[in-house]
Amino acid sequence: MSGSGAPEQSAPHALGMRVTVVAAQWHERIMGGLVAGALRAVEEAGAQASVVRAVGSFELPVLAAAAARGGAKAVVALGVVIRGGTPHFDYVCRAATDGLSRVALDTGVPVGF
């Protein structure tokens, strides 16, 4: 069971906190819903959100780093990569994951993705 043992979810309290949502532009039909959901969650927590758009998921770490170094107290990175018949999916996902993890470790700013 994948949900077994999961913690109960409650809206965190982040009154006045600045959160940057970094979102890729590819697959806008899907991304629109993801961005709207992220903004809703940030708002419910009492934080202030801004949105920065990346060309694609590969570029998310660069913009996440800029947001973290620019004063964001947390970064939410959103991207959609659809698996096809080539290894492109693996390359992009690995680079984005490694890069976003590196941003969090290097800056001390939480990066959710």
PLM feature segments, named:
Residues 1-6:
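Short gly/ser/thr-rich secondary-structure transition/capping motifs
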Residues 22, 94-113:
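C-terminal binding/interaction regions
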Residues 52-77, 83, 87, 101-105:
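N-terminal small/polar loop signature for handling phosphorylated ligands or for N-terminal nucleophile
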Residues 90:
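Serine-dependent acyl-ester chemistry module
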Residues 10-54:
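Glycine-rich phosphate/diphosphate-binding loop of Rossmann-like nucleotide-binding domains
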Residues 33, 37-40, 62, 70, ...:
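Alpha-helical macromolecular-interaction surfaces
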